[in-house]
Regions:
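N-terminal helicase ATP-binding lobe
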Residues: 1-188
Length: 188
């Protein structure tokens, strides 16, 4: 960690352009920092490969600068995620004594959905997150990703990413960290 303006971006690009010399993925917390990485490549002689600098996840290049969200966006729903989330929620209802068995827990959820859709949706969202977190903690973080994030990762793998630069990584939450560990393994 160094103060703003101390040259971290330029140092990172130097390591990539002059030492590593492999396709790189730069991940940043926002689009302003993402664009900064691409813009600073103009300070280096890329031997005519300047056109291969990208900020578009659909067109990765020798250096692809993206936001963390482009490769870590979680899935929001889907039958399989919802099924597991509802099962987890039902187990909690039984543990807390709000339902006697699995069938009555499912009936409780259905009644809530019919009578208070907004609260039901809020609770389901909470249990989806718990399921995603549990999968990520147990080595299945890639399963938790939205289809667009998975597609972005596949395209990045095809260009042969040899270096991942994490800008502002000290701000990363556990979700991103777990996923990025698996992303590195996926690229290897």
């Amino acid at each position: 960690v160094a103060p703003p303006g101390s040259g971290k971006t330029i140092l990172g690009l130097y390591v990539w352009a002059d030492l590593i010399k492999k396709p790189a993925l730069v991940l940043s917390p926002n689009s302003a920092i993402q664009a900064q990485w691409a813009a600073r490549t103009s300070l280096f002689d890329l031997n005519g490969k300047d056109a291969h600098i990208s900020t578009d996840p659909k067109k990765p290049g020798l250096l692809t600068s993206l936001t963390y969200q482009a490769v870590t966006m979680p899935r929001k729903g889907g039958e399989d995620l919802d099924h597991v989330a509802l099962q987890l929620w039902a187990e909690k209802l039984m543990t807390d004594g709000q339902a006697d068995d699995h069938e009555s827990a499912l009936a409780w959820q259905k009644s809530l959905e019919d009578s208070n859709k907004k609260y039901y949706t809020s609770r389901l969202k909470t249990y989806r997150k718990k399921v995603r977190d549990d999968f990520a903690k147990n080595g299945n973080a890639m399963w938790t990703l939205h289809e667009s994030a998975k597609a972005n990762l596949m395209r990045l793998k095809e260009v042969g990413i040899g270096l991942i630069i994490l800008d502002e990584c000290h701000h990363l939450m556990h979700h991103w960290g777990r996923i990025l560990v698996e992303v590195k393994e996926f690229f290897d």
